[in-house]
Structure formats: C-alpha cells, structure tokens
From Swiss-Prot:
It comes from Rattus norvegicus. Residues 1-103, 338-358, 705-724, 732-803 are annotated as: Disordered. There is a cross-link at residue 382 (Glycyl lysine isopeptide (Lys-Gly) (interchain with G-Cter in SUMO)). Zn(2+) 1 binds at residues 461, 497-498, 615. It is found in: Apical cell membrane; Cytoplasm; Membrane; Cytoplasm, Cytoskeleton. This is 3',5'-cyclic-AMP phosphodiesterase 4D. InterPro entries: PDE4_UCR (IPR040844), PDEase (IPR023088), PDEase_catalytic_dom (IPR002073), PDEase_catalytic_dom_sf (IPR036971), PDEase_CS (IPR023174). Residues 757-768 have a biased composition (Polar residues). GO terms for molecular function: 3',5'-cyclic-AMP phosphodiesterase activity; 3',5'-cyclic-GMP phosphodiesterase activity; 3',5'-cyclic-nucleotide phosphodiesterase activity; ATPase binding; beta-2 adrenergic receptor binding; calcium channel regulator activity; cAMP binding; cyclic-nucleotide phosphodiesterase activity. Induction: Up-regulated by cAMP and follicle-stimulating hormone. Belongs to the cyclic nucleotide phosphodiesterase family. PDE4 subfamily. GO terms for biological process: adrenergic receptor signaling pathway; cAMP catabolic process; cAMP-mediated signaling; cAMP/PKA signal transduction; cellular response to cAMP; cellular response to epinephrine stimulus; cellular response to follicle-stimulating hormone stimulus; cellular response to lipopolysaccharide. Pathway: Purine metabolism; 3',5'-cyclic AMP degradation; AMP from 3',5'-cyclic AMP: step 1/1. Keywords: cAMP, Cell membrane, Cytoplasm, Cytoskeleton, Hydrolase, Isopeptide bond, Magnesium, Manganese, Membrane, Metal-binding, Phosphoprotein, Ubl conjugation, Zinc.
Length: 803
C-alpha cells in the first residue's frame, strides 16, 4: 500500500494540500504529526478502514482501465495479503458515498467506474444533490413541530425512521478527509500486544494507514458490524445472489452481479477462506460479549487496556512521567482506591454529629429586594464599564471568549452576565416565560455559591463552560437538532455543574471520610452535591426560573440536567468517550450513515459529551487563556497537596508543589484525555471543529517545547541512583471483562526511579508512531547510551521524595 500511495499523483484540486496548478502535493506543515503520502492517493477510492489485531482482509485494488465501447471487464481479484504482522484491516465505503447514497457496503470495489466518478466528483466539488439544506436539520415536516418528547420520542409528523424521510433527518456523518492530515490519538493504535506491535503498524504509519480518505474504525461493535457486512457481501458474490433485491439492512445501489465462471477456482477458494476467517473473528468477538454489558462497554474496556499500556510506558521514563501517569490513571479511569483513612480530629467529630437533614453549603442570600423589571441593568449587573463590557460580549458566540476580562469588567459576575446574555441571545426568556428579575436573582444567588477563594473551580470556570456549551450548541452540524428544552437543560447544567466546589477532589473527600462522601456513598460525590445545591437554590425567594414550565417539562429538564452533570465526573471519562465513539462508528458502518438521534439515550449522550468537552476545553482555547487556566488548576492542586501533607496523608499525584512537572502534565493530559475526546467530537460534527483541533495541536506543541530537556546524569549520579531506588509504581486495571488475556491483565510494568538531586525532566508522551516524543539528537544519543549501561533507570525530577 505504501507503493500505491507514493506512485499515484494527487488529483488537481482534490485536496487542500494540492496546489492549484497541477497534481503536485504540498508538504504538510512541520507541526502536523502525519506523513505526507496521503496527499498522493487518488480520491476515486474513498473507504473506511477498520482496525482489529488478528487478521487482515486485502484492500480493493484501483479500478482497471476500461476499453472504449465495450462493457466493463469483470471486477479485479483482491491482491495478496500484506506481510505478516500487519494490522488487521476492514474496508467499508466512504462517508461521502455513504451519505450520498445512504449506505454502500465494503464491496464497493465491485461498483462501476461511473459510480466511483460520481463519488469522486461529490467529494471534490462538494456537490451533493439532496443535501442543499443544513446538514443536520430535521425534515421540513418537523420545522413546525420539531419538538422531541423526552418520554415518548419524536413528536407527531414524519418519523425520522420513515424511508421517505430526506437524508437531513438527523445528524449526517461526514467523510473526514481533512482529519486524515492530523495525528490521531492513541485509540488508533493496534490493540495487539504492545511490546510486539512495531511502529510501522501504528495508525499513523504510511504502510498501515497513510492513505487519503481513510477512516479507521476502532470500536469493537462497529468492527463486528462491518465484518458481518463483509461476510454478507462475500457470500452474495460467491453464491451469485447479487441480483437479489437489496434489503433495508444492506442496500446495494447498482451493484453488478458477479459470474462465478469469471473467477478462477483458486481465487474462489481464497475468497471463501477469507470469508470464513472473517466470520470466525466475529464469532470470537461476540462470544466475549456478556448479556449484562452494553456493546459500548467493549470499547470502554479496550480503551482502558490501551491507555493502561501507554501510561505504563510513560511511567517507566522518569519520575515526572510516573507522576503524570498516576494522575491520569487515578482521575480518569474510575479506579477503586484502597486508602488508610486518617483518624478524625475532635473538631471533625463534633461537626459530624450534626444532622444530615439539609443540603450543606446553601446560604441564605437576598438579591430580590433590590431588583425589579424596570431597573435591571443591560447585562444583569451594575458596572461602570458597560460599554467596554458590551464590546467584549460581542464575542459571546465565538470560541475563545476572554472570560477573565469579562469577570474583571462585571465586578466578578461573569456567570450572571454570560448566562443573561445567552438567554437573551437564544430568546429563552420569552420561550419559557422566565421573568428577567427572577433569572437575575437566581443567577446572582447561584454565583454567590461558587467559592471565590477556589482558584479553578469557581464562577469564572462555570461561566467559561456555559459559554463553550453555547458555542458547541450553535455549531452548524447541530443546527435544529436539539429542542429549546434540551438547549435550556444543557446551559442550565453547565451553569450549576461545579457550584459550591470546595477545591478538592472526590477522592480527597472519600479519603477524609467527609460528610459529603457519606451522604452520597462515595459515588460522584461532588457532582451529586452540585446538582443538589443547584436545584435547591430554585426554591429560594424569587429564584424559580422554571416556574412557568409544565410539570412534564420540569421533569424532563431535571432528568436531563442530572444526567449531564453526573457525566462531568472525570472518572467516567473513558466510559463516556467509548459510548460516543461506538455510536459514531456504528452509524458509519451501517446502511444509513445518518445518526438519527430519535431516542432519549442517543440525544442525552451527545449532550453529555458536549458539556464534557466544554468542561475539558481549556487546552483548545487561545494559548493566553489556556496558560491562565493551567496556572489556576495547578494552584488548586497544590493547595490540596498542602492539606494532605498537613494531615499526614499520601499526597495525590500532581498535587505536590515541590516536584510536579506542570509542562509534562499538560502534554500528557492532552495526549491521553483531551485529544481523544475532541477528536471523537470532531468526527461527530465534521468539519465544524477543525479549528478547535488546530488550536489544540498548537497548544500542545507549545507546552512540549517548554519542557526542559534532560542531560544525561554523571556516572557517579547513575551509581547513586542504582543504590537509592525507591518503591516501584505499577498500574493495574480491573475490567469487567471475562476472558481477558493474561498479557492484558499483567500489562502494567514497574518503574525504577533515580533519587539524584537533578532538576532535569525527560519528555515522554505519545507520538504519531510511538509513545515517546524524541528529544534533540544529542540528548537522544546520550539517553540511548545511558539505557545500555543501566536499563530502565529513570531520571529524577528533583531531590524531593516521590509521592
């Protein structure tokens, strides 16, 4: 495939990377973490590639030249399989073809050249008949009644499942061609044994996947669906059942019949053998699926295994890498911690004797007495710089609003100002008959329950998440998809999602046997508390902004807000990511290529991920804002570490101000958490989030460039390090997956640490072809020499003891 990719010139005008004068491809910018061969692959073969580790189905060859005035020749036979060890691949039709024709299968190689030309023309010119309207709007019959009933599904009118419904009846998954230039996340690595997986087989290898138009499928359930589709199509080809009317499940437009006589016996046996192999793989996957687990849990367990391997490798490189790995593992993998709970002090014992009959943290505030509809300021709060504030708020619909400037201009009322502006912008006050004085009273009361002395999880963060959610709701891909009630629920959930945050983590509250942890049984402690406070404040005087909603609307909004806020628990990150990626990829390989979002489960899943993306959006903002957020979160972490030190507790990862590697933590945070999430969101709304991904890449590059490069330690230091090795850290994951291999369970490896008093830091994160970012040539050579003399000995970050 590498030879194919490099020998065929790119079609002029077929891609942004091609110049306008001919087929010569421009080199990819240096900051893009991809090879350049994808510019040279012809657009006549759009396809999805599916990744699973054990077998390989050969790709379709390019179409043969057609003699003039003669019928097309028989379809070419599949090429021989790739060399051993290649990543298993499966092919399905492109997103562009799929959306245009509502579902070609992976036997697209049998289509006539004319059909391929139409596909290529549609991709290159953007001309797609039937999709002139917004790509994700409801059909015309919904425009007057486009309300989704949370309890009963879609409202009266044409059902999205109606075969006569236009392709715009839902969220249409677009072909992701531009995305192929960008480095993919670790999710696209092979799930085979990490140590036996060569670099060339990674997602970013020119051999494995550097083909223009590829889209790799990594979730197991979507892989099974695509493989079964391959089996179905191969069976049809082998048995001459191609003339059969296409089923609803597998529509085949203009697929020519294949005469068995035109296939040699050897090729026939080969195709039959590959079909049987494909079916065996599907059966193996389905046998591991337990009835009590969802199909997305297959993806969640797979992603956790892969992240565990990445973190284990990262932890072996240095103490700072080990600390970053611990932080990511403890925060985002929903691990169960065995901790020694310290004995409570006498003051704490007396405090715990108080009854738990009321929600803690709710204060009695009076904002309504001075507010009337006639005297409410323009932006809800009094400010002497109203005109300057108005200028800043002109960007409320744009990504990267300077929320710190708004906090300064509004007298530290950014949440009230931004929420009021968004409600006015979206006309929610009129739609739900919300009195403006009631809205301002509630918002000011809510904002007062965010702690001003908490560095990160305060009212500014809440305002930032609200505004980010507002922008994501406005993306062209989601135009007219969500109802006004769903929009209100998402914005309200964003506003309350961190109210009364104490500035410490859930695990800290659990470890200290806090009252909140007892009340919520150690399960999403803070998230449950935020919801309780947010809804409790609605009961305060003149604070019920939902007073004019019907009973059913209130129940639906409460249900959605609860589901959204609980999903902001970072320990649920992997499950949330797996759910979304499974949903997106499953629709890519099914017949429609259209995400209908015709049930509550799918719709709330998108909203949950939207707010989760907004909550993890700091690295996607302009660098100036991102750095301020980083300083704030590290300050909050260090304060928690100081409290843990005072109590004699083990200091949480990244919370020890004496040895935390801030720059490396941000690179790891982006590589293993933020990038995979935003990459999946960008697939969902493609191409609307491409600028966000570009900013994320630039910010990662900046933090990577600021990591001090480590010189190799002196021989004496090396000897001292070998004598002073500390306790080794090992990652362990408990997956709810029976039949997991021993290599998967024992994939965690130990790290050897050096206690030399060096301030150096070794950069080690995920790269496009390996999990290690190379240093400059001199340092890299020294590191290799050191590794030969003392295997697996890390470079210490400082002389302080490890946490």
């Amino acid at each position: 495939m590498e030879a194919e990719g490099s020998s065929v010139p790119a079609r002029a005008g077929s891609h942004e990377g091609s110049d306008s004068s001919g087929g010569a491809a421009l080199k990819a910018p240096k900051h893009l973490w991809r090879h350049e061969q994808h510019h040279q692959y012809p657009l006549r073969q759009p396809q999805f590639r599916l990744l699973h580790p054990h077998h390989h189905l050969p790709p379709p060859p390019p179409p043969s030249p057609q003699p003039q005035l003669q019928p097309p020749p028989p379809p070419p036979l599949p090429p021989p399989p790739p060399p051993p060890g290649a990543t298993r691949g499966r092919y399905a039709s492109s997103g562009a073809s799929r959306v245009r024709h509502r579902g070609y299968s992976d036997t697209e190689r049998y289509l006539y050249c004319r059909a391929m030309d139409r596909t290529s023309y549609a991709v290159e010119t953007g001309h797609r008949p039937g999709l002139k309207k917004s790509r994700m709007s409801w059909p015309s019959s919904f425009q007057g009644l486009r309300r989704f009933d949370v309890d009963n599904g879609t409202s009266a009118g044409r059902s999205p499942l109606d075969p006569m419904t236009s392709p715009g009846s839902g969220l249409i998954l677009q072909a992701n061609f531009v995305h192929s230039q960008r480095r993919e996340s670790f999710l696209y690595r092979s799930d085979s044994d990490y140590d036996l997986s060569p670099k060339s087989m990674s997602r970013n290898s020119s051999i494995a996947s550097d083909i223009h138009g590829d889209d790799l499928i990594v979730t197991p359930f979507a892989q099974v669906l695509a493989s079964l589709r391959t089996v179905r199509n191969n069976f049809a080809a082998l048995t001459n059942l191609q003339d059969r009317a296409p089923s609803k499940r597998s529509p085949m437009c203009n697929q020519p019949s294949i005469n068995k006589a035109t296939i040699t016996e050897e090729a026939y046996q080969k195709l039959a053998s590959e079909t049987l192999e494909e079916l065996d793989w599907c059966l193996d996957q389905l046998e591991t699926l337990q009835t009590r687990h969802s199909v997305s849990e297959m993806a969640s367990n797979k992603f956790k295994r892969m992240l565990n391997r990445e973190l284990t490798h990262l932890s072996e490189m240095s103490r700072s890498g080990n600390q970053v790995s611990e932080y990511i593992s403890n925060t985002f993998l929903d691990k169960q911690h065995e901790v020694e709970i310290p004995s409570p002090t006498q003051k704490e014992k007396e405090k715990k004797k108080r009854p738990m009959s009321q929600i803690s943290g709710v204060k009695k505030l009076m904002h309504s007495s001075s507010l009337t509809n006639s005297c409410i300021p323009r932006f809800g709060v009094k400010t002497e710089q109203e005109d300057v504030l108005a200028k800043e708020l002109e960007d409320v619909n744009k990504w990267g609003l300077h929320v710190f400037r708004i906090a300064e201009l509004s007298g530290n009322r950014p949440l009230t100002v931004i929420m009021h502006t968004i409600f006015q912008e979206r006309d929610l006050l009129k739609t739900f008959k919300i009195p403006v004085d009631t809205l301002i009273t509630y918002l000011m009361t809510l904002e007062d329950h965010y702690h001003a002395d908490v560095a990160y999880h305060n009212n500014i963060h809440a305002a930032d998440v609200v505004q980010s959610t507002h922008v994501l709701l406005s993306t062209p891909a989601l135009e007219a998809v969500f109802t006004d009630l769903e929009i209100l629920a998402a914005i309200f959930a964003s506003a309350i999602h961190d109210v009364d945050h104490p500035g410490v983590s859930n695990q800290f509250l659990i470890n200290t046997n806090s009252e909140l942890a007892l009340m919520y049984n150690d399960s999403s402690v803070l998230e449950n508390h935020h919801l309780a406070v947010g809804f409790k404040l609605l009961q305060e005087e003149n604070c019920d902004i939902f007073q004019n909603l019907t009973k059913k609307q209130r129940q639906s909004l409460r249900k959605m807000a609860i589901d959204i806020v609980l999903a902001t628990d970072m320990s649920k990150h992997m499950n949330l990511l797996a759910d979304l990626k499974t949903m997106v990829e499953t629709k890519k390989v099914t017949s429609s290529g259209v995400l209908l979002l015709d049930n509550y489960s799918d719709r709330i899943q998108v909203l949950q991920n939207m707010v989760h993306c907004a909550d993890l959006s700091n690295p996607t903002k302009p660098l100036q804002l991102y750095r301020q957020w980083t300083d704030r979160i590290m300050e909050e972490f260090f304060r928690q570490g100081d409290r843990e030190r005072e109590r004699g507790m083990e200091i949480s990862p990244m919370c020890d101000k004496h040895n935390a590697s801030v720059e490396k933590s941000q690179v790891g945070f982006i590589d293993y958490i933020v990038h995979p999430l935003w990459e999946t969101w960008a697939d969902l709304v493609h191409p609307d989030a491409q600028d966000i991904l570009d900013t994320l890449e630039d910010n990662r590059e900046w933090y990577q460039s600021t990591i001090p490069q480590s010189p190799s330690p002196a021989p004496d230091d090396q000897e001292d390090g070998r004598q002073g090795q500390t306790e080794k850290f090992q990652f362990e994951l408990t997956l709810e997956e029976d039949g997991e291999s021993d290599t998967e369970k024992d994939s965690g490896s130990q790290v050897e640490e050096d206690t030399s008093c060096s301030d150096s830091k070794t950069l080690c994160t995920q790269d496009s072809e390996s999990t290690e970012i190379p240093l400059d040539e001199q340092v890299e050579e020294e590191a290799v020499a050191e590794e030969e003399s003392q295997p697996q000995t890390g470079v210490a970050d400082d002389c302080c003891p490890d946490t």
